[in-house]
Amino acid sequence: VIMCADKPGEILEHNDILLNLNPPCRIKDTSWIKPGKVMREVTLTTEGGKALVDFAVKRNLQYIHFDAGWYGFEYDKASDATTVTLDPRRNPKIDALNLKEVVAYAKQHGIGVMLYVNQRALQQQLDEILPLYKSWGISGIKFGFVQVGSQVWTKWMHEAVKKCADYGLMVDIHDEYRPTGFSRTY
């Protein structure tokens, strides 16, 4: 598809072309998809998570997000995104985060919880973490440091997003993902 215009602004006026070249939404029940504002929790502690939930309620935010470090050092192949194992560089208190307690607290206050997971863990554990995160009450996953642009990685990304949709988990892509219109379908 080639888009042409007399003025650059006219391209933006017709930026729905790529979106509309994709099939319509294939998700039968989209009620779980709730766009909103999210704020990152940086202390990786139960207290910090609850405090951020309270902040989110007061500021009309819809989600909190636990970033890198909640399942270990994200660049270590041994890090396991099925466990809450804090990266000691981020928080030396190994048992400082009771994620299930924070998720329950957030749910009581109408706030969703999202988790950061980098591509290394996503590639190795995606099929394992999706049902687990669903059972934990997680609202979505922030894909981190994913490869973007090539056909191979775009296909991988689309398949991963489809799998997340099967479990009712929203996806936030951390990196410079190039829109392909796939968001119309999933």
Indicate where each model-derived feature is located.
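Aromatic- and carboxylate-enriched substrate-binding clefts and catalytic-loop regions
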Residues: 68-186
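Conserved structural scaffold segments of CAZyme catalytic domains across common CAZy folds
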Residues: 1-108
